[in-house]
């Protein structure tokens, strides 16, 4: 009984010195992504009103099987696309510690992460644009040519308030903030390929042109210390601040290369391209 009493007394003592709060949120939502579907008709026939591309589903299967066999690359789905997802994670935590009568410490942590799906750029290229949208009545793109956005914001702060005497107080604040905006790719790395038919855009496969290595990062670390002295009718504050910033922005257009072919046959037989771009 004596041991139990001592343990409970120590627990109550700790609780009165420590206060903490934790909150987490998770939000997931979906929305229609690719509204277009490939044509099921023999040879392919487009219907703008019903969002049917002229790209024949058998042609998509032919190219999919070809690149899988020759290059070991899976271009992704070409029918029955999943809805686009939007994911958001939030976490917040706070700890207040009454160290003693003279010193109080507060720690705060916040992080937010979001991911959102997006469809391939409609007409962009390395030099001249495609002459029609990559998802539309004239053309269709494989699923792994789409991409996503990823955003992360994380902050951590610590604040120590000290009373050295009735007339001398000190406040120490340390903060760190991390911000990163990047993109996510679908599938393995592969050059982006546009295939034309009858002089117009017909199908697209490969990694989206502007996604790989598209990354922005910003880190800030700071320390601020202020001493306040009460001199009767006068209040004197002196302090110092240190701040370190790190910023990075990377961008490469078509890092895996870009190729445009006049027809499916030209692509599969290795004929000369209409246009290409490599780093």
Residue spans for each PLM region:
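Transmembrane beta-barrel wall of Gram-negative outer-membrane proteins
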Residues: 1-117, 148-170, 174-176
């Amino acid at each position: 009984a004596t041991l139990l009493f001592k343990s409970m007394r120590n627990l109550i003592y700790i609780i009165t010195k420590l206060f903490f709060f934790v909150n987490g949120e998770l939000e997931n939502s979906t929305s229609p992504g690719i509204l277009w579907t490939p044509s099921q008709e023999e040879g392919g026939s487009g219907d703008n009103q019903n969002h049917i591309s002229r790209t024949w589903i058998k042609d998509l299967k032919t190219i999919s099987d070809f690149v899988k066999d020759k290059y070991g690359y899976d271009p992704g789905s070409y029918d029955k696309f999943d809805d686009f997802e939007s994911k958001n994670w939030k976490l917040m935590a706070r700890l207040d510690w009454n160290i003693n009568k003279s010193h109080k410490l507060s720690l705060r942590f916040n992080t937010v992460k979001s991911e959102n799906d997006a469809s391939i750029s409609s007409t962009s290229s390395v030099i001249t644009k495609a002459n029609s949208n990559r998802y539309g009545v004239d053309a269709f793109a494989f699923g792994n040519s789409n991409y996503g956005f990823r955003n992360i914001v994380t902050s951590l702060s610590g604040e120590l308030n000290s009373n050295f005497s009735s007339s001398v107080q000190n406040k120490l604040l340390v903060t760190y903030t991390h911000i990163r905006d990047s993109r996510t790719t679908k599938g393995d790395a592969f050059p982006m390929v546009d295939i034309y038919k009858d002089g117009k855009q017909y199908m697209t496969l490969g990694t989206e042109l502007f996604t790989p290595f598209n990354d922005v990062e910003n880190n800030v670390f700071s320390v601020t210390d202020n001493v306040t002295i009460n001199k009767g009718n006068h209040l004197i504050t002196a302090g110092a601040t240190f701040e370190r910033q790190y910023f990075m922005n990377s961008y490469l257009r078509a890092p895996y290369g870009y190729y445009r072919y006049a027809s499916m046959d030209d692509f599969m037989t290795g004929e000369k391209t209409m246009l290409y771009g490599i780093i």
